[in-house]
Structures are given as structure tokens and as C-alpha cells.
Amino acid sequence: MRRIVLIATNLLLVLLMLVACQKKEAPAVTLKKVVVTLDWTPNTNHTGLYVAKELGYFEEQGLDVEIVQPGQNTTDQVVASGNSQFGISYQENVVLARAQGIPLVSLAAVIQHNTSGFASLKSAGINSPAQFEGKRYGSWDSPSELAILKTVMEDSGADFSKLQIVSGVYDFFTTIGKDADIEWIYDAWTGVEARNKGMELNYIPLKDLNPVFDYYTPVIICNETLLGSDPEMVRSFMAAVSKGYEYCIAEPVKSADILLKHVPELDVELVRNSQGYLAAEYKSDAAKWGYQKNEVWRRFIDWAFDNRIIETSVISDKAFTNDYLPE
């Protein structure tokens, strides 16, 4: 009897050792490394990316995603070259790139409507582009910026040549009312910060001036080559990102805290108020987050061609796709 017990015990030990060995030898899941390059310093336009990283949405899709800021080269350049698989850019940039034969593609609209516009101190009494004549405009020197200004001024009956352009203006709070009377701001960030500071501004939303300028800004981009070589990875990335932005819409306070955890140098009040603002804007009136309409692209492309921003027109449905958004 003792012999039977001893044999049974030895067999059990052998089985346990085999199971332990199998567990040790089980191959670890290899995550595919992916880089996404931001357009600027981290802010609430990017929160969905940080949420997807923090809550494991990328890992669920088999991805190890690194979020980086642009260096000497622009985001468009590093994505076009393949040094970054994905990036945050703008509809204007994608149109300009494609007109030059650079195959960038927009995969999703981060925000459904353009939340940027022209801001001035309330004391300046500027309420319309018709009042831009004789004023100083602080420019960040983008290719389409002055053409947009010219259009909205002429639409209001004003003479664009009577607007003084001050080049290289980037910090709204140190320049407005000093170096410039009018500047172009993103209301969800700079506008929120101004309100936090108690500044009284007149703000003119760009989308209210002309439907052409209710374009997508920012957008998530990739290189067209990547869509052909690894479409499943693109689909996996976008599934995780979509889940991240849907979380931002449902949980603005928690998502703000996630952004602050990853970028602790950001102002807490600014991030939380901006996140609350964007919770209603990310998806807005679209059926789902990220969805892009052909007419929005077509309008801007036609305007850019008519105003000689681009020398050759662009096929709108080649510049963007909704195919990689989750159902």
C-alpha cells in the first residue's frame, strides 16, 4: 500500500513539474511597436491617445504605442517618410501634401467641427472681419492662413491689404493687445485658458464665417503605403484610439486626470475645463467619433485650388477614409 502511495505521489510531482515547465515555456505575447507623433505639445486634443495607452486599449489590440512630440521635422514629414506610423495633423496640411504628391491620408477627425477662430481683446471692439482693416494680425505663418483671412475679410466687404500682418506670433497671452490686435486661437485650449484668467475677449468662430472653413482640425494621419502594407495594424490602432476618445466623451473628468498623469506639467484647471469643453465637441453631431464627410473635404479642396493654395486639385476621397474606424 505504501508503495502505491509513493508511486502516486511521484507521478503527481512529475505532473506538477511538467505543468510548471509548460507555463515557463509559454511564449510571451509580442506587441507590435508603433509610434504616433503629436502636432504640438500634449493637450486635450490628444487625450484619447493617452487614455488608450493608460487603460490598455492599445495592448488589447497587440500594440505597444509610443506617443512622441515632433522634433526638427514636422509631423507630416515623419509620417510621410515612414519614421512614424501615425500622426496628428490638420485637413489643410493633408490637402497641401497630396497636392505635392505626398501620400498622407486622414483616418479620423479628432474633433467634428472647427473650434478655432479669431480672438481680440473685448476693449478693442472688433466683432467682425469687416473691422479688421487698419488692425494688426498676429500670424503663425501657415500656408493657408492669410488666404483664409483674405477670404473672410472680402466676404465681409473689407480690404485685406489694409490689414497689417505681424509675422511669427505664437504666444497669445504675451502678444494680444501689444504686438497684435487679432490672433487666431483654438477656443478649446487658448480660449478656455483666457476665460480661466478672467480675460474678456471677442471671439469670432471660423466655422460661422464660411462653411468652407468648418474643416477638420486636427485629424489622425498615416502614410498611404501603410494602408497597403499593414491594414490590420491600422485597423487595430484605430479601434483602440476610437475607444480612447469615446471614453473621453463619456468620462471627461477621469480622462483629464489621465492626461495630467502622463503630462504632469500641464495646468490642472486648464486641462479639466478644456476636457469638459471637448467632451461635447469630439463627436458632436456625427454618428460616431472620427467620422469624416466627403463634402467637408471637397469644399476645402475646391477653395484651396481656386485661391491658388494648391497648384493641382486633390481627389477628396483619396485624402481621407472612414474604412478603419470600428463599426
In which residue ranges do the predicted regions lie?
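Short, solvent-exposed loop/beta-turn-alpha elements that line the ligand-binding surface or hinge
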Residues: 60, 130, 208-213, 281-292
